[in-house]
């Protein structure tokens, strides 16, 4: 094909899903001329599966994206139709925000955000090859014959590389929602030396709202007080749409088991790996055979559509079996399927080929993010896109990568898990993956990360000033709580009325608030609150810091120990095969992963404590030969 020079950019982003949008906005907002290429303008920030943002572990990622200056939190705050804080019966370490989105408005808002960004161009085309000179990437070539040159390329291809749809015996190459698929790019990546693999995911059917009997389902309403995803917002309350809960039946199970061999998953047609924590209904029935019923959530896809998403019943069964199966579910007996369920298989990369900066090892200036890296979920994708965008800019500027470690952010946990351990299935973030989750709460993401975002040039002045004001307000209120006191006379009658233990002597509000039964609302009832001048989120911060102070201090000490190993840096040019004392497996793994620190090396499967001791001795020898300077 004849190529023509179509333009020069600092950064080119391939794909405009959740990863691509964050990557392109980050590079453009940091002052670099950016091009984002998508196969369809109608698929920008598409939600091809669940129409929601957030959830357990995922809400934390969105809050962190926002704290660093990303877009996802702002976008969902504009377009949510129901919001719920999950895990409120547990401690704040696992509180996770989740919002149902109007998926069509979400797409429109993100598309408009891209269009309004001065340093960002949008092109509808298909990237078919990565242009390179040796191992240095210099741009991309497209299906329309365009040659775009750039200083960095970010791959955010989602599930579109050689994507194949499965519904029972029916299979065809296509992207989600009847969109096209990328047929040629994988070959170009293999030519560059990338190790590719096949993963699978799936989605349930969408059914017509008017064909559902909601009267036999349980109503699931949103929170009365809505917590925004973005730290730039305070009050975003509006009329919310209800969701509904129903369950499968024994008849559902019978339909599935009778047709199990017709499922693409169980007929042997699909051999790729699917997401463990989002199993198909076939997997649920087989793996949890003792259960005769599984819960399903009925969720609206938007305000101006009658499509309803049936969460919890993704499948690759044939369409006619789907029709029989859905009609065995309480409330769906007469349902009309508008879009059938399907499984989708796609190419992705082995993420152990990535540096922690998300640059491909051995290929200069090529970065990647999102499902291409083996993850699942919009939030995981967006987080990677943001970090890939930041680090593409820093590579252009000749600066060290921007790295968040496991003690600083869920984003740090995500990236460290991917590049250090790899993944054999689509990776999903969960609170249990974060060792320091009491410190890495969603409520303090701005306190942890906004200064960092400002220092690298992504957080703008208005957000930074808001952060400084909140920080000062928290410190001021915390000081007031420590200095202001309550007496038995002031509080005991109310405490006894509420069945709580009276106090014997006067104590500070800080000590009073430490008591399990004392809430900030109780302080306000006693006339001891800060009043309306102090925001709800500032009060929440003070309560959490006060009640969990001992636990947080203990975790901070653990983080200090963790940092000692993280701060012992390893040069990526080290030849591990030349270090005596390392076991053969450790040498191979270390040469492959190329960890940036002793801490990261210690988390590599196959590297033992004895191997770490050898590395520490090696670093000490290097330090001595350099006259005690550095590691």
From Swiss-Prot:
Location in or out of the cell: Cytoplasm
Keywords on record: Cytoplasm, FAD, Flavoprotein, NAD, tRNA processing
Positions contributing to NAD(+) binding: 274-288
Family annotation (InterPro entries): FAD/NAD-bd_sf, GIDA_C_N, MnmG, MnmG-rel, MnmG-rel_CS, MnmG_C, MnmG_C_subdom, MnmG_C_subdom_sf
Gene Ontology molecular function, alphabetical: flavin adenine dinucleotide binding
Top-rank lineage group of the source organism: Bacteria
One GO CC term on file: cytosol
SMART domains per the UniProt record, alphabetical: GIDA_assoc_3 (SM01228)
Subunit structure of this chain's protein: Homodimer. Heterotetramer of two MnmE and two MnmG subunits.
Function: NAD-binding protein involved in the addition of a carboxymethylaminomethyl (cmnm) group at the wobble position (U34) of certain tRNAs, forming tRNA-cmnm(5)s(2)U34.
PANTHER family: GLUCOSE INHIBITED DIVISION PROTEIN A, PROTEIN MTO1 HOMOLOG, MITOCHONDRIAL
Family per record: Belongs to the MnmG family.
Identification of the protein by name: tRNA uridine 5-carboxymethylaminomethyl modification enzyme MnmG
Organism: Clostridioides difficile (strain 630)
Designated gene of the protein: mnmG
């Amino acid at each position: 094909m004849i190529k023509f020079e179509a333009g020069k950019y600092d950064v080119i982003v391939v794909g405009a899903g959740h990863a691509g949008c964050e990557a392109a906005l980050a590079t453009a907002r940091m002052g670099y001329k950016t091009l984002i290429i998508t196969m369809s303008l109608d698929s920008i920030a598409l939600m091809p599966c669940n129409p929601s943002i957030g959830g357990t572990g995922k809400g934390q990622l969105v809050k962190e994206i926002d704290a660093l200056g990303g877009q996802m939190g702002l976008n969902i705050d504009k377009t949510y139709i129901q919001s719920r804080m999950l895990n409120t019966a547990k401690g704040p370490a696992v509180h996770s925000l989740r919002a149902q989105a109007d998926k069509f408005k979400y797409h429109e808002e993100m598309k408009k955000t891209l269009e309004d960004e001065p340093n960002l161009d949008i092109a509808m085309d298909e990237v078919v090859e990565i242009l390179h000179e040796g191992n240095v990437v210099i741009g991309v070539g497209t299906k329309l014959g365009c040659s775009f040159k750039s200083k960095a390329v970010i791959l955010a291809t989602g599930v579109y590389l050689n994507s194949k749809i499965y519904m029972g015996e029916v299979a065809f190459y296509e992207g989600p929602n009847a969109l096209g698929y990328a047929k040629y790019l994988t070959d170009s990546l293999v030519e560059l030396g990338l190790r590719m693999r096949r993963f699978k995911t799936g989605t349930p059917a969408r059914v017509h709202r008017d064909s559902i009997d909601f009267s036999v389902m349980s109503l699931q309403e949103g929170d009365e007080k809505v917590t925004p995803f973005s730290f730039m917002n305070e009050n975003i309350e509006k009329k919310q749409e209800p969701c509904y809960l129903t369950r499968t039946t024994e008849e559902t199970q019978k339909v599935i088991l009778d047709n199990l061999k017709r499922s693409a998953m169980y007929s042997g047609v699909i051999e790729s790996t699917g997401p463990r924590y989002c199993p198909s209904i076939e997997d649920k029935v087989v793996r949890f055979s003792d259960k005769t019923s599984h819960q399903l959530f009925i969720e609206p896809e938007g305000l101006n559509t009658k499509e309803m998403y049936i969460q919890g019943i993704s499948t690759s069964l044939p369409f006619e079996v789907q029709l029989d199966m859905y009609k065995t579910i309480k409330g769906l007996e007469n349902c009309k399927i508008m879009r059938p369920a399907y499984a989708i298989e796609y190419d992705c990369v082995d993420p152990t080929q990535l540096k922690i900066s998300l640059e491909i090892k051995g290929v200069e200036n090529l970065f990647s993010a999102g499902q291409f890296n083996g993850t699942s979920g919009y939030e995981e994708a967006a987080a990677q896109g943001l970090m890939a965008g930041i680090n593409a800019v820093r590579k252009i500027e000749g600066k060290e990568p921007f790295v968040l470690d496991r003690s600083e952010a869920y984003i740090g946990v995500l990236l460290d898990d991917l590049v250090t351990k790899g993944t054999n299935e689509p990776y999903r973030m969960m609170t249990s993956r974060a060792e320091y989750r009491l410190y890495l709460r969603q409520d303090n993401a701005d306190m942890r990360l906004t200064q960092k975002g400002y220092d690298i040039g992504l957080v703008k002045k208005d957000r930074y000033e808001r952060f400084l004001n909140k920080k000062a307000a928290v410190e001021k209120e915390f000081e007031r709580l420590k200095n202001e006191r309550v007496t038995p006379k002031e509080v005991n009658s109310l405490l006894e009325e509420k069945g709580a233990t009276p106090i014997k002597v006067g104590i500070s509000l800080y000590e009073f608030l430490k008591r399990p039964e004392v809430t900030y609302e109780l302080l306000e009832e006693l006339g001891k609150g800060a009043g309306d001048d102090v925001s709800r989120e500032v009060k929440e911060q003070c309560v959490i810091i006060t009640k969990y102070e001992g636990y947080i201090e203990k975790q901070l000490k653990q983080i200090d120990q963790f940092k000692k190993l993280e701060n012992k840096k390893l040069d990526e040019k080290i030849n591990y095969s030349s270090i005596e004392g390392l076991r053969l497996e450790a040498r191979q793994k270390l040469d492959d992963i190329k960890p940036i620190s002793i801490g990261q090396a210690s988390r590599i499967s196959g590297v033992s404590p004895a191997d770490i001791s050898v590395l520490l001795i090696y670093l000490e020898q290097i330090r001595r030969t350099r006259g005690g300077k550095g590691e």
